[in-house]
């Protein structure tokens, strides 16, 4: 399904991406959903909560993408035991999570790192 969406020219248009106030980011960015790396391999940059489609074509494209990802037979669903964590490279994995269930006996540390990093 992603192959078909990757070939759709709408996926290579610039999309506007915003953030809710809770993220403390007061600017928007523009980039396509699909592009290619230096070797021509497909890449995806997508977060389902923040797109601001600029027209019906973009809105329909995002809906098809969301439906395709949700219906995918390739997704992995796992439960993390209390005290476990996952570190994921956002440039390699698409990921999501359900809301945290509050546990008064645990503390949660959220670390956001933004910026450019050394690339070998």
Task: Cite the ranges covered by each PLM segment.
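Active-site environment of non-heme Fe oxygenases that use a 2-His-1-carboxylate facial triad
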Residues: 1-82, 87-120
